[in-house]
Design a protein with these regions (language model features):
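Conserved lysine of the Walker
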Residues: 38
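Conserved P-loop NTP-binding catalytic core
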Residues: 42-108
Length: 222
């Protein structure tokens, strides 16, 4: 079973100068004033997943470029974004795996990603292993995940499902043209899209294949 996310660090993203969170429970509730960075903190998780699956560049470009995402406040400005995820100790021989990505912009405001993997045990001593990749326009982690012969394949293989599941879903659009109110094909049911465009097809699949989970959803809505 994939180990859970245990610790999150975000630096330099939007209004966030630096935030550290211990994610030790199944549900984490974020409370803060408007503009304090709650949505940015959640978006950081999705951004990491998109770095790993090589779709972050398109996302950042559609958001007016990398530099526009940097923190800029009374305490100064930054020239990069840092996101760090630590996986709880699991199948990696009792070791915790930390993945870190630093996102910078080149002269054309295109993103460059520097990734780092670190393994640590309970002793508190220096890391048992640390390796940095990049800067590059593509994820080294994704490349390793596609290469069973790579020495880090086993560790990355257990990490990919965790980071790939970090997606943000926005269901609060109630306008006439909201994607959730549109049509979707029955076959578009492999995964739930972030804008809920295919929610009808997806719920149909859940109802047919996982009726217990479907009833839990129905009960929660009611």
């Amino acid at each position: 079973m994939t180990a859970a996310l245990g610790h999150l660090v975000v630096e330099g993203l939007g209004p966030i100068r630096r935030v550290e969170l211990d994610l030790t429970t199944d549900i984490t509730v974020l409370i803060g004033a408007n503009g304090s960075g709650k949505s940015n903190l959640v978006s950081a998780l999705e951004l990491v997943s998109r770095v790993v699956d090589n779709t972050a560049t398109d996302r950042l470009t559609r958001q007016a470029g990398v530099a526009r995402q940097y923190f800029d406040g009374p305490s100064g400005s930054v020239d990069s974004i840092l996101i760090e995820l630590t996986q709880e100790k699991s199948s990696n021989n009792g070791l915790s795996l930390t993945y870190r990505t630093r996102i910078e912009n080149d002269i054309n405001d295109q993103p460059l990603y520097t990734e780092e993997l670190t393994f640590q045990d309970n002793s508190g001593t220096p890391p048992l292993f640390r390796q940095e990749f990049g800067p590059s326009q593509h994820s080294a982690i994704q490349r390793i995940a596609c290469d069973p012969a790579h020495e880090l394949y086993g560790a990355v293989e257990s990490f990919i499902p965790l980071v790939s599941s970090c997606r943000v879903f926005h269901f609060d659009d109630v306008s006439a043209n909201a994607p959730v109110k549109g049509f979707s094909t029955v076959g578009d049911d492999i995964y739930l899209r972030s804008d809920a465009e295919n929610i009808a097809a997806y719920l149909l699949k859940v109802r047919n294949d996982h009726p217990e989970h479907y009833q839990r959803i129905v009960s929660a809505v009611r």
